Amino acid sequence: MSRYRGPRLKKIRRLGALPGLTRKTPKSGSNQKKKFHSGKKEQYRIRLQEKQKLRFHYGLTERQLLRYVHIAGKAKRSTGQVLLQLLEMRLDNILFRLGMASTIPGARQLVNHRHILVNGRIVDIPSFRCKPRDIITTKDNQRSKRLVQNYIASSDPGKLPKHLTVDTLQYKGLVKKILDRKWVGLKINELLVVEY
């Protein structure tokens, strides 16, 4: 299954708030219909929705998500927490959390167009896994700095997670440590994703 490129508000109405997908919010009370399902289908639907939240928020394909679940399953710690740590340490997500891009798809585009450096080297793979003490900067040219400048100026420094620091004057971000569960930017029950 390929990456979702369709109407984003439709997904937000169905799954709830997905800050990485878009900044838009649906109108209040639009198309809120109550549906009643049997108990067994209800459990399946809840697990599917949690999985879809994760997929659409981080912009993953089905295959990528399965690969991350497989890697997290091999770890000795809680599979759900390791899964969220893997997803949060992706380069496109870190750019979004630093405030260098308005959404995760916007951050993917910055990375794909070679505007981002990690430890002084150009990285053009959005799924690049960042490690503690990685320094993320923009290229030195004016165009790259201008793209990031608007987003950094409008971002809220109070929303910056504790595992990241940002220097707004030099357009530089630093990954201090691996993310703690309470700083994940999405309200999700990761155990239901692993069970699915």
From Swiss-Prot:
GO biological process, one term: ribosomal small subunit biogenesis
Sorted UniProt keywords: Chloroplast, Plastid, Ribonucleoprotein, Ribosomal protein, RNA-binding, rRNA-binding
Annotated Gene3D superfamilies: Ribosomal Protein S4 Delta 41, Chain A, domain 1, RNA-binding S4 domain
Domain S4 RNA-binding: residue ranges: 89-150
NCBIfam families: PRK05327.1 (NF003717), rpsD_bact (TIGR01017)
Record function comment: One of the primary rRNA binding proteins, it binds directly to 16S rRNA where it nucleates assembly of the body of the 30S subunit. With S5 and S12 plays an important role in translational accuracy.
Subunit structure: Part of the 30S ribosomal subunit. Contacts protein S5. The interaction surface between S4 and S5 is involved in control of translational fidelity.
Protein name, UniProt field: Small ribosomal subunit protein uS4c
Species in which this protein is naturally found: Bothriochloa ischaemum (Yellow bluestem)
Gene name of the encoded protein: rps4
